A protein has these predicted regions:
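Cytoplasmic membrane-interface "Motif A"-like loop-to-helix N-cap segments
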Residues: 81-93, 271, 343-362
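Central cavity-lining transmembrane alpha-helices of secondary-active solute carriers
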Residues: 62-79, 126, 324-337
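C-terminal ends and interior cores of transmembrane alpha-helices
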Residues: 91-112, 358-381
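Glycine-rich segments within core transmembrane alpha-helices of 12-TM secondary carriers
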Residues: 68, 143-163, 170-171, 183-189, ...
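Intracellular juxtamembrane helix-capping segments at the cytosolic ends
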Residues: 124-138, 402-415
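Hydrophobic core of transmembrane alpha-helices in multi-pass small-molecule transporters
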Residues: 99, 110-125, 282, 380-402
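Intracellular loop-helix junctions on the cytosolic face of multi-pass helical membrane proteins
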Residues: 1-19, 139, 170-300, 304-310, ...
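Short amphipathic helix-loop junctions that connect adjacent transmembrane helices
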Residues: 38-58, 295-322
Length: 494
């Protein structure tokens, strides 16, 4: 049973946050535990347990992550046109649970089969929670950014726990327990959604509600069946990363054509300019992800072999630090950065959204430069300081905080309501291309190591991080220079 509450009543909430945001916060938190838990073990597991060389593992990692995010674009379209956000989320969550349970049954035998299910499930789940958050607010509600800030904190609490617990269980107990933990928290997330979705009332309902039930059910069943029909094809592409390029290029062309079609169909100059501005942010996010998403690939492998296990006065697994410290920093510093923007806004000196995007690249460059300096803190065994590594992540995270919480918010501000799902899908698709590019960059970093010692690996990897710092700095400066042009496209949107 759905509550009789109307959309207008939801959007006219009192206070800072609507209660529905807290429910979506919890659902997303558990799903992010599952996602980041898997992400944090991918490259490590493939090298340590499946015996892949590091360059190949980076490519495989990039391919898997690319498929995950590419399918969010497809899932967003099906949610927009047929299923609605609620049914899409529920279906995706169940498929993700099945994928993790399959791997947990026999990690070495069923790894790629389970990953295939997780890719499809995440595609249906991921874009929908953030889209429903956007619908909790009126178009010009100034509380929207604060809502996405809280939602972003939920993502990172899940990411922090997911980054630390599964890899710890896998390395110290069993890999079956590692993947089982991801399945268990996903079950909690799905149950949470089932118990609270009535409070969302019309938000996320099927766009085909007014169609006759028989016709609507036929469309929905076709989506579900089609999702399982493509499993063999996705599996083949996952185990053969050479196919990834063909898939990504095809997906990119289709996505651009579909975006162009929807842009033309708007037939409203103001809306078209706003949608073009949204596309600029989406492309910027692609560049950011291509550089920053080394954390699950090359940085994970760097932490595996080239970092000491001492952080300040504590002993801790470097891979636990690599997988979770970024999310920990986000939880700690996200509200502080939010307060900084408020402080600056009161004094009318807050940078606009485009400048914030540019600053994110500058800080990302500084973070990777600190990773590069790890070579100056190395001992005779080729182990560098975990403290320096953690400092690099702190600066890197401050850059992320300039783009992450406001990114999804600005996309929903610039997009017509009927295109929310597609534009959030494009946002995640840009991440898919970023993940794909990150895998290639990580593979180049690994392949540059022609030696056999930990010291030669450290030199090769830190050289790569220096190059990434340069790329990021150039991108940041370019965005800042182009700010006036992009602001004109955005019109009244801040």
């Amino acid at each position: 049973m759905e509550n009789n509450i109307t959309l207008e009543e939801i959007q006219n909430f009192k206070g800072k946050y609507p209660k529905q945001l807290w429910y979506l916060f919890l659902v997303e938190m558990w799903e992010r535990f599952c996602f980041y838990g898997m992400r944090g073990v991918l490259a490590f597991f493939m090298v340590d347990q499946l015996g892949l060389v590091e360059g190949k593992a980076n490519l495989q990692y990039g391919a898997i992550q690319a498929f995950v995010y590419a399918f969010t674009f497809i899932g967003g379209i099906f949610a927009d046109k047929i299923l609605g956000f609620k049914k899409s989320l529920l279906f995706g969550g169940i498929v993700m649970i099945l994928g993790n349970l399959l791997i947990a049954a026999s990690p070495h035998d069923f790894f790629y089969y389970g990953i295939t299910l997780s890719i499809i499930g995440t595609g249906f789940f991921k874009p929908n929670v953030s889209s429903m958050v956007g619908e909790l607010y009126h178009e010009n509600d100034g509380r929207r950014d604060a809502g996405y800030g809280l939602f972003y904190a939920g993502i990172n609490i899940g990411g922090m726990l997911g980054g630390a617990i599964p890899i710890y269980l896998g390395k110290n107990y069993s890999w079956s327990l590692c993947f089982l933990s991801a399945a268990i928290v996903m079950i909690i997330g799905v149950i949470t959604f089932l118990l609270t979705k009535k409070h969302l009332a019309p938000i996320g309902n099927s766009p085909l509600e007014k169609h006759e039930p028989k016709k609507r059910n036929l469309y929905e069943i076709a989506v579900y069946v089609g999702s399982f029909v493509v499993i063999p094809f996705v599996y083949i592409m996952v185990i053969n990363s050479d196919f990834t390029e063909y898939f990504m290029y095809t997906m990119g062309i289709v996505a651009l054509l579909y975006f162009a079609y929807e842009l033309i169909m708007l037939k409203d100059g103001k809306q078209q300019r706003k949608l073009l501005a949204a596309f600029v942010f989406i492309f910027g996010y692609f560049m950011f992800m291509a550089i920053s998403e080394q954390s699950g690939g090359s940085l994970s492998l760097f932490a595996k072999d080239n970092l000491s296990n001492k952080l300040l006065f504590f002993h801790i697994d470097p891979n636990v630090v690599n997988n979770s410290i970024n999310s920990l920093y986000v939880v700690i510093f996200s509200p502080l950065v939010g307060l900084l923007w408020i402080f600056m806004a009161k004094r009318k000196i807050e940078p606009n959204t485009v400048i914030k995007f540019g600053l994110s690249f500058v800080l990302l460059a500084a973070g990777f430069f600190i990773f590069y300096t790890a070579r100056f803190f190395v001992n005779q065994d080729g182990l560098s300081s975990l403290d320096v590594f953690a400092l690099g992540y702190l600066v890197y995270t401050l850059g992320e905080l300039c783009i992450g919480p406001i990114g999804m918010s600005v996309i929903t501000k610039l997009s017509p309501k009927r295109l929310f799902g597609m534009m959030m899908g494009l946002w995640f698709l840009s991440s898919a291309f970023g993940q794909f590019a990150a895998g290639k960059l990580g593979a180049e970093i690994s392949d540059a190591n022609t030696g056999t010692t930990l010291m030669s690996k450290l030199i090769a990897y830190t050289d790569g991080y220096y190059q990434l710092a340069v790329y990021s700095l150039v991108a940041g400066i370019a965005l800042i220079v182009l700010t006036p042009l992009i602001r004109r496209l955005m019109q009244e949107v801040k």
